[in-house]
């Protein structure tokens, strides 16, 4: 069977959305058709031993398109009979494409995420993306926003070959009734109107705007509580903000939780909100925002920020709302609407579940990935 070599700096056990996406793409292929080449990372040996396909580790934690990395990748191609390469992130490892073709690779696919939209604004990085686009067969994109931004950096020929490839959602894991009541009981939140946010605690994600909106929400919805799930260095600043605004008693910081426990934390909420915002003059933007889709799969209405590709994960007015993540008032409005009208919130949550089941399942992503790797028209 022809094999695909996945060349990536972003791979578990290192944590992050890109790492999870690339791992899921590898797992979406038949196990005997995949080989992964990734950097060393703490805990990698134990993680790799659980995988159904070979994972070959670089000697350190970063791979660059230098002769040593190319030579090792060429050895893997020849040893495993690979004819296709999937670059887990287009830049910079996509520059290895010509050298891998010399080793026998016939098709090169480069995956993009959210950060490339910022790179496309910078002269040096834009030239790098253009070169990679010309050297691979396909550059993938998450959604329409990123396609527009990337098109400006690519040559017309490379832009014409772009294909959408976005993450999927495991609808068997993320579903209503997956343990939310237990989470509520454990955190002392049973019976309270609850807004949940699942994300790293960083400025772009907008947890600070949820806290700034919270006095207005609390004034309208008695007993409302906010549950922030995720870790990060921003936590201390958020805790201080909640104390200054005198809402600390109604804001719960759950910290980081294992992936296997996330469905229960989504299920605990009545509404999901992550009012992300674009920062650094467009260099720091949200990717697709898979958390909105996981929340929809869990039966929750969502409130998303208008950054990057986040709106692509919401059917406006049907599965949730898209708001200006820079405005506390804009964030508070839909939260109050949804918490004050449980029937409407539940209906939007049901619509979200149906939409994710129909459009965002991982088996659909697997079919699309298979077509992209083979050169067939994607479904």
How does the language model describe each region?
Residues 273, 292, 297, 301-304, ...:
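Short hydrophobic beta-strand element within catalytic cores of glycosyltransferases
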Residues 223, 250, 330, 337, ...:
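A short, well-ordered alpha-helix in the C-terminal region of glycosyltransferases
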Residues 7, 140, 181, 189-205, ...:
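Conserved donor-binding/catalytic core segment of Leloir-type glycosyltransferases
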Residues 134-178, 189, 252-254:
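Donor nucleotide-sugar binding/catalytic pocket of nucleotide-sugar-dependent glycosyltransferases
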Residues 87-93:
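Short His-centered aromatic/hydrophobic patch
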Residues 250, 256, 267-285, 300:
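Acidic donor-binding loop of glycosyltransferase active sites
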Residues 315-317, 321-328, 337-343:
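Conserved acidic donor-binding segment of nucleotide-sugar-dependent glycosyltransferases
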Residues 239-261, 271:
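Nucleotide-activated donor-binding/catalytic signature segment of Leloir-type glycosyltransferases, i.e.
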């Amino acid at each position: 069977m022809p094999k695909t070599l996945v060349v990536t700096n972003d791979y578990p056990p290192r944590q992050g959305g890109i790492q999870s996406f690339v791992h899921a793409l590898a797992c979406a292929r038949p196990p005997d058709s995949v080989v992964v080449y990734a950097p060393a990372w703490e805990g990698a040996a134990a993680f790799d031993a659980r995988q159904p396909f070979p994972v070959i580790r670089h000697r350190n934690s970063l791979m660059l398109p230098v002769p040593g990395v190319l030579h090792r990748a060429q050895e893997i191609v020849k040893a495993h009979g690979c004819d296709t390469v999937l670059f887990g992130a287009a830049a910079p490892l996509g520059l290895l494409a010509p050298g891998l073709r010399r080793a026998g690779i016939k098709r090169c696919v480069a995956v993009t995420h959210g950060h490339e939209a910022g790179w496309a604004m910078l002269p040096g990085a834009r030239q790098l993306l253009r070169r990679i686009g010309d050297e691979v067969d396909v550059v993938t994109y998450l959604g329409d926003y990123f396609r527009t931004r990337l098109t400006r950096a690519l040559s017309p020929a490379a832009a014409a070959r772009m294909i959408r490839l976005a993450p999927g959602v495991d609808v068997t894991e993320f579903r209503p009734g997956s343990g939310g009541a237990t989470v509520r009981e454990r955190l002392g939140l049973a019976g309270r109107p609850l807004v949940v946010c699942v994300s790293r605690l960083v400025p772009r994600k907008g947890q600070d705007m949820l806290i700034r909106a919270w006095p207005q929400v609390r004034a309208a919805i008695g007993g409302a509580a906010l549950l922030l799930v995720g870790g990060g260095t921003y936590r201390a600043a958020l805790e201080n903000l909640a104390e200054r605004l005198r809402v600390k008693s109604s804001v719960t910081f759950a910290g980081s939780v294992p992936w296997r426990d996330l469905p229960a934390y989504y299920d605990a909420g009545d509404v999901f909100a992550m009012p992300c915002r674009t920062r650094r003059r467009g260099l720091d933007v949200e990717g697709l925002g898979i958390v909105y889709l996981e929340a929809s799969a869990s039966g929750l209405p969502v409130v998303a920020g208008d950054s990057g590709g986040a709106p692509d994960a919401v059917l406006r007015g049907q599965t949730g709302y898209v708001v200006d993540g820079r405005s506390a008032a804009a964030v508070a409005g839909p939260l109050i609407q949804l918490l004050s009208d449980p029937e409407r919130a539940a209906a939007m949550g049901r619509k979200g579940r149906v939409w994710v089941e129909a459009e965002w399942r991982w088996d659909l992503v697997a079919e699309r990935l298979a077509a992209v790797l083979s050169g067939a028209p994607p479904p």
